[in-house]
């Protein structure tokens, strides 16, 4: 049922758009679940990887009971302890292994949870990734923010949220080459060699509030 107060309708529409925006910017499977347990937003990668011919409402219930239970436990922890780091290191869905992260999205009194799926069936060694997440601290991330130029930091934020170099160049009024050079400096600073490594650092840094605020500021300035 639609709200009778137009202002409430606008607020609910904005919340929906915000959630859809969050999942659309990711280049990995991502979804948002609300407090009713419904998938309120999914991106194309998620639909292609997990939904297929399924009814989207049935996806969660199609998972093995043990997997669904572990997902639900982490999701509830994310809702009740927004500052905690909630993730499942390795879970099989279909024929692939995934690292799944649960990030609370808070809209006033309403808490939804963003789910991010990192495929572990790649050429990345699990132990290396675990060490990478451990070694990149919040202080190191802030050190990069303080040492980088304004453009380097903005490119880092946009690229990590899934924007391609062409889009970044257009948003920031720079060349594609400048965007690529900025990412090369990011790799050099953190001692990494691939976008997968960068995403692991980005999404396990526990600094999502800062990153989301920075993203909205960048996009607002580009309007």
Swiss-Prot record:
- Subcellular compartments: Cytoplasm
Q: List the disulfide bonds.
A: none
Identify the species of origin. Answer: Escherichia coli
Write out the function statement from the record. This protein is essential for positively regulating the expression of transfer genes that are involved in the conjugal transfer of DNA between bacterial cells.
Entry's Gene Ontology cellular component terms: cytoplasm
Q: Which UniProt keywords apply?
A: Activator, Conjugation, Cytoplasm, Plasmid, Transcription, Transcription regulation
Could you identify this protein by its name? Protein TraJ
User: Could you list the residue ranges forming a coiled coil in this record?
Assistant: none
Identify the NCBIfam families for this entry. PRK13719.1-1 (NF010272)
């Amino acid at each position: 049922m639609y709200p009778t107060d137009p202002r409430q309708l606008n607020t609910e529409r904005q919340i929906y758009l915000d959630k859809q925006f969050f999942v659309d910017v990711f280049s990995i499977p991502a979804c948002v679940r609300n407090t009713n347990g419904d998938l309120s937003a999914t991106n194309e990668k998620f639909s292609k990887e997990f939904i297929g011919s399924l009814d989207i409402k049935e996806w969660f219930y199609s998972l093995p009971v043990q997997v669904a239970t572990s997902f639900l436990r982490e999701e509830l922890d994310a809702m009740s302890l927004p500052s905690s780091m909630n993730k499942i290191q390795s879970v099989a869905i279909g024929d692939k292994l995934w690292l799944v992260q649960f990030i609370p999205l808070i809209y006033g009194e309403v808490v939804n949870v963003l789910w991010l799926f990192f495929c572990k069936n790649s050429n990345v060694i699990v132990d290396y990734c675990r060490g990478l997440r451990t070694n990149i601290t919040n202080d190191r991330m802030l050190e990069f923010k303080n040492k980088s130029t304004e453009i380097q930091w903005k490119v880092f934020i946009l690229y990590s949220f899934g924007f391609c170099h062409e889009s970044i160049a257009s948003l920031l009024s720079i060349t594609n080459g400048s965007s690529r050079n900025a990412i090369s400096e990011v790799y050099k600073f953190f001692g990494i060699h691939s976008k997968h490594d960068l995403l692991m650092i980005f999404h396990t840094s526990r600094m999502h509030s800062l990153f989301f605020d920075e993203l909205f500021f960048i996009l607002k300035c580009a309007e």
